[in-house]
Amino acid sequence: VKRNYLPLKTTVKVSTQTQLPLHLVITHPQYRFVDLFAGIGGFRIALEKLGGRCSGYSEIDKQAIQVYQQNFISYLNSDEIAFGDVSKISNLPDNLDLIVGGVPCQPWSVAGCLRGFEDPRGKLWFDVIKLVQKSQPKSFIFENVSGLASPRNRENLELIIDELTSCGYQVYWQLLNAYDFGLPQNRERVFIVGIRKNIDNYERFKFPLPLGIHPKVLDILEDIKNIQPVKKVKLSADTLFNGFVPPSRTRFQKEDELNDFFIFSDLRNGHTTIHSWDIIKTTERQKSICLALLKLRRSKKYGEKDGHPVAFSTFLEIIPDLKIEELNQLVSLGICWQTTAGKYEFINSKNMTGINGIYRIILPTADIIPTLTATGAKDYIATISITATHPQEYKQLFLKKIYKPKKFREITPQDARKLQGFPDNFIYHPQSAIAKKQFGNAVPITVVQAVARNLLEIILPN
């Protein structure tokens, strides 16, 4: 019987069988590795596919350990070492070929406020470096969020690389995106690879090139079928962006096509932005007042950062005939609120919090899903597709055919499993929120496999 859930239980027990192919456990391994910050085993799946055997793993999250043991620990390897807290490991097994790990990324992410080494989790890098120095494996692969390579954190990245280099390694790093390795997810991560300098050809390592395989979101959706691919109409920048293309657009957002997602936000005004005044019944006059607030609250004239509540007198600069009663009507409608200073601001005034619990609805015909995160973005997937020839028509079709009839659903653990490249027989946590958090913390398996394959060609030439 195929299982995709964990048995409900209160204690962690070792399974008497593993859901992964048993030959991965009982055949002679080609190399040995240790799995630090193991999570639910993304690194391990990739490395076992390439003939490796795990000599031990380190993880402190009890729910992640439960999932990890359910999938990887059986009577055949029940003596495998569980190291626990990385900061408390004194010794690793001798003669390791490889150490891997997704060092906690929150200190370097936007969600973690980019605190870096100021965050205790950021200091775990030094524990990792000490283990590399002491155990001297042939090589290592570490993964982290792209924020570690941002200009703000570049000095920290260089410090990490310098410290690892001083341990006797040639160190390489590169940003790699899961989309380039056969997964329909925009997930860019830093990969840091080191090879001990007494290994032959250590200087010849190269990061893998993109595979050129690009499945669509539809390919990973098990419950949404019979949707034909959409041929998008080419439109001018004037039509889409009023002549100015926002610099924040990603490589997946084409400058001559309609977006394949809709953002719910009162803070921006893109061609697929849904505002609260699009959802709540409002007059054209009320809509124009809301757009005026959107513009004024972002003006540098009132401060360096955007998000400034706007006074009635400021509104009069661009709407001279505005009545204060009109602003108070928007307060009554639940679109705005009035501060203690008598200024006006949107109720939905935080970026990425969305409206009515929704931040983004992605069309099933999209090329990618945005990055899965441990914190869980308020993203949904539409269950039908739409197409249009003009932004306004597109927006109205979305509201009429998808939003109002609720033709959308949450991203499920099954979706997350496929977006990260985990196999179909992987047993994930029975609670959806926990499972999605764990997949959001995981590494994309196809990327690890591609990096590891190139590394193994150096450290295992035979």
Q: PLM features: what roles do these ranges have?
A:
Residues 3, 20, 262-462:
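C-terminal target-recognition/interaction regions appended to catalytic cores
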Residues 71, 207-210, 386-389:
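Short Gly/aromatic-enriched secondary-structure transition segments
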Residues 41, 62, 104-106, 146-147, ...:
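Short, solvent-exposed loop/turn segments at secondary-structure junctions
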Residues 33, 57, 81-82, 171-173, ...:
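Conserved beta-strand scaffold positions in the cores of enzyme catalytic domains, especially
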Residues 89-96, 111-362:
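Class I S-adenosyl-L-methionine
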Residues 106, 219-225, 378, 426:
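Glycine-centered loop/turn positions within well-structured domains
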Residues 3-136, 142, 146-158, 165:
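Core alpha/beta nucleotide-donor-binding catalytic domains of modification enzymes
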